[in-house]
Amino acid sequence: MTKQYKNYVNGEWKLSENEIKIYEPASGAELGSVPAMSTEEVDYVYASAKKAQPAWRSLSYIERAAYLHKVADILMRDKEKIGAVLSKEVAKGYKSAVSEVVRTAEIINYAAEEGLRMEGEVLEGGSFEAASKKKIAVVRREPVGLVLAISPFNYPVNLAGSKIAPALIAGNVIAFKPPTQGSISGLLLAEAFAEAGLPAGVFNTITGRGSEIGDYIVEHQAVNFINFTGSTGIGERIGKMAGMRPIMLELGGKDSAIVLEDADLELTAKNIIAGAFGYSGQRCTAVKRVLVMESVADELVEKIREKVLALTIGNPEDDADITPLIDTKSADYVEGLINDANDKGAAALTEIKREGNLICPILFDKVTTDMRLAWEEPFGPVLPIIRVTSVEEAIEISNKSEYGLQASIFTNDFPRAFGIAEQLEVGTVHINNKTQRGTDNFPFLGAKKSGAGIQGVKYSIEAMTTVKSVVFDIK
């Protein structure tokens, strides 16, 4: 019999009347079960968090930081245990899964330290007008209250920690909703917060079926801030339900790699492979299309093809480069994009092959803009090459996307690269490197349908706080 995992609510581990069974994407074996919470149980989570918030916010930054450092230490101690489960639950290579836990600990430690650098300021009215020269404003940051943190399946631990730690150090309380496929990993993360001894109600978890509690947890007026990573469709729905409440949304992307004539093609190919096929392409920041100058396209395509053929294919426990996708629905969607490109004349340079949820890495050359693969986000191991004849054409295609997360430019002409970067409608541009999240002290954001708000530890703390100004007159 597999393990029944529990939610952590108000300092206690709790089961629910109903449960959700979690299966491994690679083998189909049952990994365990998590509680399927009811709306009444959600009410209790939120009430517990609200009750705990005044005492938590009254602690100093240094006191809250001490709790977070304990959490990070526990995660480092248990990284192999958590990584082993994470690897099975989301079909991620074991080494990558352990690295995710380590990175989460690093983010939590950094957030604890960054909180100590959050300072207020004093403003003088005389800077605006002489009549107000005796007015002084003391400006401080205060927590928003209860933060609902919702993490995605592809990084259920890391993209939870990047939300939770900045919120907690700022004096907020947390209701953490892990993804259904990733819930067990999320509850293992919760064990670290529980063991660290945070006061009851400060950190809580919610697991359950989206059809039953998905809208309820977002619409609930106890929630003061919603921090979500996931699909654009769900993100847009959350935005509408949030109303006047602040939100942070990290959504989809169609990141372009623009390759100019003077690029180091070996470096370019290496980065494109890592960017496109890491975790089987199931990353919002994955390289999802290559826009290459026709004059160097043949040479680059051959280099990429050689590296695609060298990728290992198999199961997560083997640390294969390409592992099964998260579920059948996702694999079906990727297969649909592949078939559309193939039917419309794109040149498949590797074998088109699928076994269950496992899709072998596919490289398409001569993809055109009438193909779905040129525009839609596959979230799978398929990479389209689009040949262009000018920088202007590459910029135009890149900017026509409904998404605006990131882009890469490969060139040895850095002034030219900066000029192109200014024209790209994305949150981040990488020069001579793959698109990727991080480092986590950098701002991370998306334009258009790729998100709302700015992440990165300092920016996340600022987002999940509000400014209060206290004004008085000097006599």
Swiss-Prot record:
Enzyme active site: 250, 284
EC code: 1.2.1.9
InterPro entries reported for this sequence: Ald_DH/histidinol_DH, Ald_DH_C, Ald_DH_CS_CYS, Ald_DH_N, Aldehyde_DH_dom, ALDH-related_metabolic_enz
Binding site for substrate: 103, 154-155, 283-285, 437
Keyword field contains NADP: yes
Reactions accelerated catalytically: D-glyceraldehyde 3-phosphate + NADP(+) + H2O = (2R)-3-phosphoglycerate + NADPH + 2 H(+)
Annotated residues for binding of NADP(+): 151, 177, 180, 215, 230-251, 377
Gene Ontology MF terms in the entry: glyceraldehyde-3-phosphate dehydrogenase (NADP+) (non-phosphorylating) activity; glyceraldehyde-3-phosphate dehydrogenase (NADP+) (phosphorylating) activity; lactaldehyde dehydrogenase (NAD+) activity
Keywords on record: NADP, Oxidoreductase
Record bears the keyword NADP: yes
Family: Belongs to the aldehyde dehydrogenase family.
PANTHER family linked to this entry: ALDEHYDE DEHYDROGENASE
Subunit structure: Homotetramer.
Protein name per UniProt: NADP-dependent glyceraldehyde-3-phosphate dehydrogenase
Organism of derivation: Streptococcus mutans serotype c (strain ATCC 700610 / UA159)
